[in-house]
Regions:
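Active-site-adjacent beta-strand/loop module that shapes the phosphate/pyrophosphate-binding cleft
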Residues: 22, 33, 89-113, 117-129, ...
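Residues embedded in well-ordered beta-strands
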Residues: 26-28, 36-38, 102-104
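Charged phosphate-binding loop/patch that engages nucleotide di/tri-phosphates or the phosphate backbone
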Residues: 137-161
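A generic structural motif
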Residues: 30, 42-43, 106
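Functional cleft and adjacent loop/helix regions within the main domain
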Residues: 54, 60, 104-106, 112, ...
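A short coil-to-beta-strand element that immediately follows conserved catalytic motifs
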Residues: 79-89
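Acidic, metal-coordinating catalytic segment for phosphate/diphosphate chemistry
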Residues: 1-26
Length: 161
């Protein structure tokens, strides 16, 4: 069962000890039935024509999970029922002013997204076969051996269940 959410205010930095800490989050939606991941093709000025995750800024007064759900809805037009939310990676910039939380969100089935104006395409891909070119940050993450192992473990556990 999908849930419709209202749109919210623009992203704002979280203020922490007089430093601006920018938090963002992203979701690799994993369809349990097909074991495939959703990627979105970016259509904005920053890294346009690269494949990326559903995601964006964590707004003031939002938890990372609340932001994750809001971003999923805003970018694909629906919040599918998420059976499991599995932390995949927490990236922190060297200066400590930016962090990006990446999750695998397990859903039942693939769906056709209603894309926002931030994206111009989508694809569902196998865990070991990503579209090209990937967003540079996502490329770094998905080519990390530990993260590849985590993704394969999630896929294997779902196949056993």
């Amino acid at each position: 069962m999908a849930e419709k959410l209202g749109r919210s205010l623009q992203g704002r930095p979280v203020v922490n000890n007089n430093l601006k800490l920018f938090k963002a989050c992203g979701a690799l939606l994993l369809a349990n039935k097909t074991k495939r991941l959703l990627f979105l093709l970016r259509d904005n000025d920053t890294h346009s024509n690269t494949w990326g995750l559903v995601g964006g800024k964590v707004e003031l007064q939002e938890t990372v999970i609340q932001a994750l759900h809001r971003e999923i809805f805003e970018e694909v037009g629906v919040l599918p029922t998420i059976n499991k939310t599995i932390p995949l990676e927490l990236f922190r910039s060297d200066d400590g002013n930016f962090e990006y939380h990446t999750f695998v969100c397990v859903i039942d089935n693939e769906f056709i997204p209603e894309l926002s104006d931030e994206h111009k395409g989508y694809c569902w891909c196998d865990v070991d076969s990503f579209p090209k070119p990937l967003h540079p940050g996502l490329w770094s993450s998905l080519n990390n051996e530990d993260i590849q192992q985590k993704l394969n473990t999630v896929k294997d556990v779902l196949e056993i269940a």
